[in-house]
Amino acid sequence: MSDDIVNVTCPTCGKAVEWSPTSPFRPFCSKRCQLIDLGEWAEEEKRIPSDVQITDSDEWSDETRY
């Protein structure tokens, strides 16, 4: 394995982050940036693109038991 230091860019703020065990929030530079990203996913500001269109009524029922 190589001892080269790999740097990545924080997806939230753009700051350089060392990709190593000493950077616990990688690829984010901090817990703050990690939580900002999580909030964007929770608010559906970010999403994985899909061609499939699902409506609320597709395969969902209040009567479904597991």
From Swiss-Prot:
Belongs to the DNA gyrase inhibitor YacG family. Zn(2+) binds at C10, C13, C29, C33. Binds 1 zinc ion. InterPro entries: DNA_gyrase_inhibitor_YacG, Znf_NHR/GATA. Interacts with GyrB. HAMAP family: DNA_gyrase_inhibitor_YacG. Inhibits all the catalytic activities of DNA gyrase by preventing its interaction with DNA. Acts by binding directly to the C-terminal domain of GyrB, which probably disrupts DNA binding by the gyrase. This is DNA gyrase inhibitor YacG. Keywords: Metal-binding, Zinc. It comes from Sodalis glossinidius (strain morsitans). Pfam families: YacG (PF03884). GO terms for molecular function: DNA topoisomerase type II (double strand cut, ATP-hydrolyzing) inhibitor activity; zinc ion binding. Residues 46-66 are annotated as: Disordered. Its cofactor is Zn(2+). Residues 56-66 have a biased composition (Acidic residues).
